[in-house]
Amino acid sequence: MSVENKVLTNKVLTAAAMVTMVGGLGAAGTLSASAATPECGDSCIKIYSTEFGTSEQPNLVETVYQGVARVGRPTAMYPISNTDPAGDIVGHRKGLVTDFYKDGLVSAEVNRHYGNLTAVEVEYAPHGKRTGLCAGLADTAYQNEGLTLQKCGTSAKTVWIIDTADSPSTAPQGHFPLVSGSTTDFTHPYAMTATHSDSTRSRHQTTAPMQIRVTRLTGSPYHVPAGQLWGTTK
């Protein structure tokens, strides 16, 4: 594992958020007051984009649209809240990509490119109650596909790779691309992307304002755009 990956593993996949998840992305920062509902508390993590904020002031975080726990429900960027359970996200699983490959969740090609990196699944848990639904994709990743809730642990489509290798300069700050475990493009892999608008509709028409999407990663290794760099806080 590279120095950058060791730094990120220590900073991002740590503490209670990771233990609870056996997964989650971890805590790169801590807010002065809890940003989750009281029932979720320290088990929750908040996933933010550097397009909108920082670990100390994330502003917008990944949130389940209207809080509905249903397969196909979009996840989008909405204001951080300690009263709205729609933003309660916990870790479901973490491990090396090669571990997900051994369990049949990612392809041999994904393992060949990313095997030594960490991958995670993150689960919707309103008021701390797990739903078995993780942030993912309905189909194998394609350009502008929107993120939606999908059953955890069943395919590569809910697996997210912490791709420190493609943005080594931001890894020490706890910011990194999140590449879909179902990507089939390894030159410009499909990565989680936050945008200011939602003008492109998905094949399934399951859209929401500020819906998170996957788009081809650009700017690697030193100029990845802010909308494709992610971090976590508690």
Positions of PLM-derived features:
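Secretory targeting and sorting signals
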Residues: 1-35
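Lectin-like carbohydrate-binding module/patch detector with strong preference for beta-trefoil
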Residues: 36-234
